Amino acid sequence: MLDKEQLFDKAEELDELAMRYEVSVSPFFEKDYLTEFYNFYEIRNRKAKLIPSEEDLDGSLRDLSGEYRWKEIAEKTKSLFGLPERIMVFSIDDLPHLKDELGGRRGCSGFFFVFDVMFCEYDGYTLCFICGTNN
């Protein structure tokens, strides 16, 4: 299992690549990573429900916002972290009550528009992928 320093280093390496495709990556350590996510981004509306996706990382990533955006990110994720134990995805389009809190001037991960949020659960930590744009 990775310690926090190793996890941050690998997550930073993955984030560098992912940001080229307008995707940010953040590691979370709490068992209840959704609460940690809400606290980290100061989201007050907590009614959003995560929708489970397919078990396949490549398939889940491709389903979110198109293969072009995710192919290289999926490969790098697998090489750095291996396959996750579980993947949870939700689309902001399906959760309009969260759009105002996740997007806009103080938007989530620096994106003005946020499209999808995905959590890849591993043993002892969770990677959060946020797909968005400033255009």
Segment roles from a protein language model:
Residues 56, 63, 79, 104-107, ...:
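Generic detector of intrinsically disordered, low-complexity, polar/charged segments
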Residues 71-88:
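Short, mixed-charge low-complexity intrinsically disordered segments
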Residues 15-21, 36, 83-88, 115, ...:
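Generic structural motif recognizing short loop/turn segments at the entrances and edges of beta-strands
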Residues 8, 28-29, 37-40, 81, ...:
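Phenylalanine-focused residue identity feature
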Residues 86-135:
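Acidic, proline/glycine-rich low-complexity IDRs
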Residues 1-75:
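N-terminal "domain-start" segment
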